[in-house]
Each structure stands twice: as C-alpha cells, then as structure tokens.
Regions:
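Aromatic-lined, polymer-binding surfaces characteristic
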Residues: 385-389, 445-456, 486-489, 495-511
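Short Pro-Gly-centered flexible turn/kink motifs
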Residues: 231-255
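Extended, well-ordered alpha-helical scaffold segments
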Residues: 257-293, 342-361, 405-425, 467-484, ...
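Low-complexity, Ser/Thr/Pro/Gly-enriched N-terminal "stalk/linker" regions
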Residues: 22-46, 51, 234, 252-321, ...
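Glycine- and aromatic-rich loop/turn segments at beta-sheet edges
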Residues: 287-320, 360-381, 424-444, 484-501, ...
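Beta-strand/loop-rich accessory regions of lumenal/periplasmic or secreted enzymes
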Residues: 40, 53-68, 72-236
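Well-ordered alpha-helical scaffold segments within catalytic/enzyme domains
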Residues: 329-345, 391-409, 454-468, 509-525, ...
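Active-site lining segments of carbohydrate-active enzymes
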Residues: 376-380, 398-469, 484, 534, ...
Length: 676
C-alpha cells in the first residue's frame, strides 16, 4: 500500500510537471455578445479583451460599437487551474447571449472530447440522428444535458487535456415558447452552454450564458432540430456575475483523462447525500406494492406486468419479459425473499407461481428463455439476446441458492440452467465475446460484443453454484474480451437493447463483470480484475450527476423538489436520467476499500440517497398512478423520449427493471455472500 501511494504521488507529480501552465490571454481567447430586440433578429458583436493595468478587473471587454452593457473580466489562480469571472452591468434594458472561446494548442484532428454523461471520444458509436461527429465536429450543448457542466479536450498526440467547468448556484430555470431559433426566456435561468469547436483546425473550448445549442439541438429520441440560442433579460442597472474554471492536466490516455476529470469534478462540486426520510425498510415496503398490483396470473407464465405501462393508469398489460426492462424473474426472487422475511404469504405464493410457471412454459425448443411474450398479440420474440438470457439465469441462480439454503431443492431448474450455461459456452466467440442477439439455432442476428459483460455475471455465479470450472474459464475469456476491446480502448457501447450508442450500462456492466471475477479469484488474478473494475468504474461514474439541475416553475419534477445529483444519464441516444444502479453500489464500496478511494463510497451514498426521492405513495405519487411503481424515464433537460419534455416523464414507462434495480441497491452484499 505504501509503494502504491508512492507511485501514485510520483505519477501525479509527473502530470503536474508534464503540462505547461495554460495562459489566458487575448491571443488565444475570443469573446462575443449577441443582443436581441424583441421582434428583430439578434446582432452579434465581437469583443476585444483590453488589458487593464489598475483597478478591480484584469480585462474590459469592448466592441467597435457602443454597447448597452459594460463587461469586465478577472482571471485568478495559478498553474494548471484558473477561474474566469465575468462581470456585466446593463446600461439599458437588454436581452443578451454571451459567449467565449479558449483555444487549446492542439490540432482538432488529434483530439478526443468528453462532456460527462453525453459525449465520449467522438460519439461515433451513436447514429447520425443523435449528436455525434457524423453530423459535425463542433458541438455546443445546454449544461443540464451533462452530469457535470464541463467540456474536456484530450490531446491524444501530446497526452494532455484542458477543460472548462461552470461554477454557479444553478437555482433558476425559465420556460420558453419555442425550442429552436432565437428564443427569449420567460424569466431567469442559471443554465448556460458548453462545448468544443474546430476553429481553423484548432480544438477550442466554447462556453457562455444563457444556453445555446449548435449545430443542432437534440429535442427527442433520434431527433435533431435546428439550433437554438436563448436570450436572458437584464434590466437597466442590474449586474450579473458568471464564473468558469479552466483546468489543464497530463493524461496517459482517454481512460486516464476521464478518471482525472471525474475526480476533479467530484472534488469541485462536492456532492452530498440528499436528505430523505425513506429508510431501506420504508422503500421496500412501498416498492413491494408493485409485486402485488402488477402480478398477472391468467397466462401460461405468470409474471409482473412492468413493461409498456402508462404512467397515468399503470394498468397491467400482456407483456411478460424475463430481463432487461421487465426483470420478472429477479423481481420474483426479491418478492419471495422479502415475503418470507415479512410473513407475507401473498408475495411468496405469487413469486413461487412465477418460477413454477416459467419452468413449465417459459422456454424455447432449444432451451433458452422465451424472453419476451405478448400474450394478447400471440407473439413470442424469436430473437434471443444475451442480455435478457443472462439476466434470467442470474435471477434463477439467486433463487436456487436461496432455496437450497432453506432446504428446498429444484433439480429440474438446475437441469435447465446447466443446459443454458452450456449453450452460453457454445455461443461464446473465440475472442471471448458473446453476440448481442441470436436465434434458437445459434445463428447470429447481431454479432456486436457490447452486451458481453452481462453474460459474465451468471457464468461466475454458475461456476460457484455448480462447481463447474468451464463456466469460470468462459467468464475469464469474456472479461479478456472486455479488457481488449472495451476497457483498454475506452470504448463502452451498445450494452442496452433499445439504443446503439455510447451508454452508461456498458461501462457499469464491464466494471461489475470484472468485480465478480475479482471475488472469484485470488492473488495476481484478483488484483488484475480489481484494476479492470476500477478503470471501467470511472466511466460508469461519469454518467451520474454531481450537481442539481434547476427546473422552472410548472415543471413537475422541480415543483416536487427533485435533486438530480446521484441520478445517472442513460446514453447519448436516450438523454434522460434514471435509477439504473443494481449492485454497482456494492462494486463502488468494494473498490473504495480495495484502493483506499473514499470518493467511491461517498458518491455511492449520494446515489443511494438521491434515488429514493421519487418513491410514489399516498400523498406523494410523483405523477405516477400507483404506489410503488417507481418512475423510469425522468426527463431533466430539453429532451423527451416521445412526450412531455423537461420536468416530466415520458407517458410510457417500464417500472419492472426500476423496482429490481432499487431493490438490489437496498440489498447490499448479495453477490459477495453468494460467492463466499
């Protein structure tokens, strides 16, 4: 441990010495202000930074034209970190949009870019209908799209990064009548913009206030709209102060860049747990109502209806889904364990009925789960996914282990799972990956390896339960693939099934998979897998909010007091927040102890506390029709999945996986106990 700390200190010093201190000066900084008279197109004025030799400010920002505002700027700090503070006073009533550009000393083509929870590398895994280099090599976005209001430029060639981060209280938001073009805000907003631009071949940080988005604004799933530029009103005589922080550091690669950026943003924002009265016991008591009211028993396989529900009614539907957004089998195990502990015979009876019915009617001819069934439409999904199949096996292994501990045996279930795990061995590619989707005859539908880590978990558990080393070796090969193709390349993508892009779940699953193997191995192997888990964990963490997004009056999420810190952005394609966590909190606690990194445990507590806020119950239904049906698509920025926009949910949701995720968060230590 002493040697590790010494090496860490040496590397940190090398990072400091390896970067020339950024110089903020007129030769690499430009600024402009746009002024709008209602009913007229805005006029944009370039600004000149005039150095002041005395007084309270370092620079005055002036134009060739007489402006109805005075602009002054201070630059404080030394070395790698500098704060830029802009002071503005209105000489007349004005509507304005201010912007600034800071050039790096790197070629744009040599750089990768990072906007936490939204932009990784060049977003080339994302479709052209979402923000990516497919559309443009320069992007400006609203700050509330990002888990930290930061943009980082990583110079791959010279192994260094430069970032800009907004520093503010973020207390206000205002509604607008339009979502594109020049828009005048209905009140005060705290939200500015941040991003990167290619300025004559040089990678450039761009930032300003209030928000604007260019070259497009991302308003809905797979929908890019024309750019938007907001205008804030400043009354004559009023002043405004805006602050940003510029930070430079050395970084070995993009993974190191993201790691350092997350540590820096965590230390800068210092997120604290959200105060809530919802204890673990209260949470489970309320959530257990989902097991009661969603239960469907008039179909061959009994299930919890947790997919494609309407938030306005939460009426049960005909869709039974094993994993992914349904998570019927994991919820059945949770209900069984909880029901027996609380002497709730109804929960126990229904959970056992689900497992019994799936054993009899839940499999395809080849022995895979019928992972999605639409009963009224008489439709069974013929394309299997390694993710849903894996999540089903995972849940049943927990069930079998629990039953065995209570003296109950299920040889038919064990036979079924052995058949499935053996099929996994057949599906696995020579490089260790698993195809994302396949058919009953093992022919491939989607050969992408993005969902591979989902298979690692049941393979490790299957090794422990069945004492079959083949499953452990397959798990090791799968993480070997993750190490080579995802972790070492910092390229986490397409783990989820409803989007093809950079996403949170890919890095979260990769970190969790390596963690499972670390628990199942010893010595150098264990240390190696622990290191991989940590490396991937920084990418997963980067999707979770370190700050509280402001909402406007009339936006429900703001009116009920939602604090966004600790919630996770989903993906580039799906720009909303949710409570996807499962046992990643356990991973963070374990890594915190393993590497003496207190940030992991501290932020895990932020996540755990924050994700309790929207618990729907009598008098606090949070826009959901039924108690315990926790919301899924929580829309916190100018984007929606299809309906309702910022401050609300999409009208359709899948509480099945949400309840399962929160339940695992509230049940710490599960896998460590399983693998003992």
């Amino acid at each position: 441990m002493i040697l590790r700390k010494l090496l860490s200190g040496i590397l940190g010093l090398a990072g400091i010495l390896g970067v020339n201190a950024f110089e903020y000066a007129p030769f690499n900084v430009s600024a402009s202000i746009a002024l709008k008279v209602p009913g007229n197109m805005a006029v944009h004025y370039p600004l000149i930074l005039n150095k002041l030799s005395n007084g309270n400010f370092d620079y005055q920002l002036v134009s060739d034209h007489k402006l109805p505002v005075l602009l002054y700027q201070n630059v404080t700090g030394e070395g790698q970190t500098k704060q830029i503070s802009l002071w503005m006073v209105a000489l007349e009533d004005v509507y304005f949009n201010f912007g600034e550009q800071v050039k790096s000393d790197a070629r744009h083509d040599d750089c990768l870019f990072y906007m936490p929870g939204f932009w990784y590398r060049r977003n080339l895994r994302s479709p052209k209908e979402a923000p990516s280099f497919h559309t443009s090599d320069s992007w400006l976005v609203r700050e509330d799209r990002l888990s930290t209001p930061m943009t980082t430029i990583f110079d791959e060639k010279n192994k260094k990064s430069i970032s800009v981060t907004r520093i503010a209280e973020f207390e206000d938001e205002a509604l607008t009548t339009h979502k594109e073009g020049e828009v005048i805000l209905s009140g005060k907003t705290s939200i500015g913009y941040t991003g990167f631009e290619n300025v004559s071949g040089t990678a450039t940080l761009s930032f300003g206030y209030p928000y604007k988005e260019a070259p497009k604004t991302y308003i809905r799933k797979l929908t890019l709209a024309p750019s938007v530029e907001a205008y804030q009103f400043l009354k004559k005589g009023e002043t405004l102060t805006l602050t940003w922080e510029i930070h430079e550091t050395a970084a070995e690669d993009f993974s190191d860049c993201v790691k350092q950026a997350w540590e820096y943003s965590y230390d800068l924002y210092k997120p604290t747990p959200v105060e809530t009265s919802y204890t673990d016991e209260i949470m489970k008591d309320v959530l257990s109502n989902f097991f009661v009211e969603s239960y469907v028993d008039d179909t061959p396989t009994k299930y919890y209806s947790g997919v494609e529900l309407r938030t306005a009614t939460c009426e049960n539907l005909d869709v039974a889904e094993v994993g992914f957004v349904g998570r019927t089998l994991l919820n059945a195990f949770n209900a069984l364990e909880y029901g027996e502990g609380k002497q709730r015979a109804d929960l126990v009876k229904n959970a056992n009925s689900i497992f019994d019915s799936y054993l009899q009617h839940g499999f395809s001819e080849a022995g895979f789960f019928n992972e999605v069934v639409h009963y009224k439409r008489n439709f069974v999904e013929k394309n299997h996914s390694i993710r849903r199949q894996s999540e089903g096996v995972y849940a049943v292994l927990y069930y079998l282990n629990y039953e065995k501990q209570h003296g109950r045996k299920h040889p038919e279930w064990e036979k079924r799972l052995k058949t499935m795990l053996d099929a996994f061995l057949k599906l696995q590619n020579p490089d260790g990956s698993f195809p994302r989707k396949f058919k009953d005859d093992f022919s491939l539908v989607d050969k992408s390896g993005g969902s591979t880590p989902s298979a690692t978990l049941p393979l490790v558990m299957g090794y422990k339960y069945f004492k079959d080393k083949r499953y452990l070796e397959a798990a090791k090969r799968s993480v070997g693939y993750l190490e080579k193709e995802l972790i070492s390349k910092a390229d986490y993508f397409s783990s989820t099934l409803d989007a093809n892009c950079e996403d949170k779940e890919a890095s979260l699953y990769a970190s969790t998979a390596a963690y499972y193997l670390a628990l199942a191995t010893k010595g150098q192997e264990r240390a190696h897998y622990a290191g991989l888990a940590k490396k991937a964990a920084y990418f997963a963490l980067s999707w979770y909010y370190t700050w509280d997004v402001p909402f406007a009056k009339g936006q429900m999420l703001g009116d009920i007091g939602l604090k966004t810190r600790g919630w996770g952005n989903v993906s580039v394609e799906n720009n909303h927040i949710d409570v996807f966590i499962f046992d990643f909190a356990d991973v963070l606690h374990w890594l915190s102890k393993e590497f003496n990194e207190p940030r992991f445990t501290a932020f895990s507590e932020v996540i755990s506390s924050s994700m309790r806020q929207l618990l729907p119950h009598e008098g606090h239904l949070c826009g959901i029709a039924k108690k315990g049906f926790y919301p899924e698509v929580v829309q916190h920025t100018n984007w929606d999945y299809g309906k309702n926009g910022k401050g609300y949910y999409n009208d359709i949701f899948a509480p099945g996986w949400v309840v399962a995720s929160l339940w695992e968060l509230l049940s710490p230590g599960r896998v460590e106990n399983f693998l003992k």
